[in-house]
Amino acid sequence: MRTFPGGVYALTRETPDTERLLAEVEAALAGGVAAVQYRDKSGDVAQRHAQASELAALCRRFGVPLIVNDDLRLADLAGADGVHLGRDDASIREARIILGPAKFVGASCYQSLDLARAAQTAGADYVAFGSFYPSPTKPAAARADVALLARASRHIALPVVAIGGITAANAAPLIDAGADSLAVLSALFDAPDVRRAAAELNRLFAAEPEE
């Protein structure tokens, strides 16, 4: 089983403009993002399948995994590298049965170390916590404490992803606390230069941790 890569985890915006979507993701990949998550809950079935399939092919060119948010069937049909599941989605065990041992299964654990322990027991490949900062895409999301990342690093033997309002200006404390990956949407795809924004975030993982 592969280990989910650490670094910048790009979360795509929802858009019917597939050409724009692919151009933005390609720029993020060129900037060094480690993984991409396709998120779209409003498009029709045909659009979502087409976008996910094209993104999977694009990510393969860069050797970067494409994860599909919430939709196990789409992840399977589009040839994605895995699925990310929330508490109301399919079970981790079901995802593992359908996708097999070589694909990634990630789990949203919100602010709960207990959910992370359960996800690990069920066979997840990574766990995600948040929201750590106010999020433009999910303004009502409950906030997580940065100390949760340190506890997770001590007690969970899986890569830890931080999510929620993350920018290059506020990301360092999350990495210092134990985040292996930063899931980012607005700070990447609302930036005037997506490639440069990805590279700036990526450089944070090479910086020396603060004492």
Swiss-Prot record:
InterPro entries per the UniProt record, alphabetical: Aldolase_TIM, ThiamineP_synth_sf, ThiamineP_synth_TenI, TMP_synthase
Cofactor details (free text): Binds 1 Mg(2+) ion per subunit.
Superkingdom of source: Bacteria
Residues involved in 2-[(2R,5Z)-2-carboxy-4-methylthiazol-5(2H)-ylidene]ethyl phosphate binding: S135, P136, T137, G165, L185, S186
Pfam families: TMP-TENI
Cofactor(s) listed in the protein's UniProt record: Mg(2+)
Residues the record lists as binding Mg(2+): D70, D89
Keywords attached to this entry: Magnesium, Metal-binding, Thiamine biosynthesis, Transferase
EC code: 2.5.1.3
Biological process annotations from GO: thiamine biosynthetic process; thiamine diphosphate biosynthetic process
An annotated GO cellular component: cytoplasm
Positions annotated to bind 4-amino-2-methyl-5-(diphosphooxymethyl)pyrimidine: Q37, Y38, R39, D40, K41, N69, S108, K138
GO molecular function: magnesium ion binding; thiamine-phosphate diphosphorylase activity
Transmembrane segments: none
Similarity field: Belongs to the thiamine-phosphate synthase family.
HAMAP family the UniProt entry points to: TMP_synthase
Name the UniProt record assigns to this protein: Thiamine-phosphate synthase
Organism field: Thiobacillus denitrificans (strain ATCC 25259 / T1)
Lineage: Bacteria, Pseudomonadati, Pseudomonadota, Betaproteobacteria, Nitrosomonadales
